[in-house]
């Protein structure tokens, strides 16, 4: 991000020199060239965050965590993180900020309409999203429905803002990560032998749900074209480079052809 800001400042500075300087007439209003030796560095490659279908299934299979004695909450942070991770995945990568702020929807509707907080203010279409509630995710949508009707989900009744909500999710994801590592019965060597092309994640982040949705959608099993994934993620860059950052490429289908 800093790189792109500096590149923009350099571009504006160069445009200003072209506009206000006239070398033929000797009129140099902007003599400085602070960016003459500056080179824009290429950003480091973004680490793929997607989890494998196997890890996703393990998250689905996690049972409810025992609540502490005297707890007034009807779910623990681990349960919250599990359910919100699956909500995000099932709703095509909905961000935590949007889960928290999503407006109330028509009672008979099976499509969620909302504006992505991250990009709404920068887009002419206000980053409007239309996501169908599939039968597999409908029980979770119902579980967390806002009883007041103010918003779609009731998370705002438990967490006063995005920071406290994200904090609870991050703590819950850490406990999910610990639980998966404690119960996992397949080590890295066995994964390699089975043809897994991606190591187990160091730590599961909430954004991994969005990356996982994109990666699984583009996998050999589903074969959804990249442009459809690009639109579903609400990306607008014509070259789809942002979408490429989300998708962890798999070569498993090529290995299958080689061994076949």
Sequence positions of predicted segments:
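N-terminal core-binding DNA-recognition domain of tyrosine site-specific recombinases/integrases
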Residues: 1-14, 68-77, 162-168, 203-204
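N-terminal DNA-binding recognition helix of tyrosine site-specific recombinases/integrases
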Residues: 1-34, 94
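Active-site/catalytic core of tyrosine-dependent DNA strand-transfer enzymes
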Residues: 12, 56-57, 132-200
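Long, amphipathic, Lys/Arg-enriched alpha-helical "connector/arm" segment
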Residues: 36-80
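Short, basic (Lys/Arg/His-rich) helix/loop patches that form interaction surfaces
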Residues: 66-75, 170-231, 235
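Conserved tyrosine-mediated DNA breakage-rejoining catalytic core shared by Y-recombinases
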Residues: 101-142, 237
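Short, polar N-cap/turn motifs at the start of nucleic acid-interacting alpha helices
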Residues: 105-113, 203, 223-245
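Conserved small/polar residues in nucleotide/adenosyl-binding loops
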Residues: 252-260
């Amino acid at each position: 991000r800093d790189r792109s800001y500096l590149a923009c400042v350099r571009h504006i500075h160069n445009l200003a020199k072209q506009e206000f300087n006239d070398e033929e007439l000797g009129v140099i209003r902007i003599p400085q060239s602070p960016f003459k030796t500056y080179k824009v560095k290429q950003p480091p490659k973004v680490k793929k965050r997607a989890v494998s279908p196997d890890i996703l299934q393990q998250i689905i299979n996690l049972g409810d965590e025992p609540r502490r004695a005297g707890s007034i909450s009807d779910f623990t942070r681990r349960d919250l993180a599990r359910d919100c991770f699956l909500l995000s995945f099932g709703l095509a990568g909905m961000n935590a900020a949007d889960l928290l702020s999503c407006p109330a929807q028509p009672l008979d509707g099976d499509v969620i309409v909302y504006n992505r907080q991250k990009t709404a203010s920068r887009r002419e279409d206000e980053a409007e999203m239309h996501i169908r509630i599939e039968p597999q995710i409908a029980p979770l949508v119902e579980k967390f429905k806002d009883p007041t009707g103010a918003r779609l989900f009731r998370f705002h009744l438990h967490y006063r803002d995005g920071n406290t909500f994200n904090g609870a999710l991050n703590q819950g994801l850490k406990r999910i990560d610990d639980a998966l590592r404690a119960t996992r019965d397949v080590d890295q060597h066995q994964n390699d032998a089975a043809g897994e092309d991606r190591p187990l994640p160091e730590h599961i982040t909430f954004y991994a749900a969005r990356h996982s949705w994109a990666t699984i959608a583009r996998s050999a099993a589903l074969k959804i074209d990249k442009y459809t994934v690009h639109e579903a993620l609400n990306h607008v860059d014509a070259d789809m480079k942002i979408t490429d950052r989300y998708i962890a490429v798999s070569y498993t289908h090529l290995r299958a052809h080689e061994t076949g």
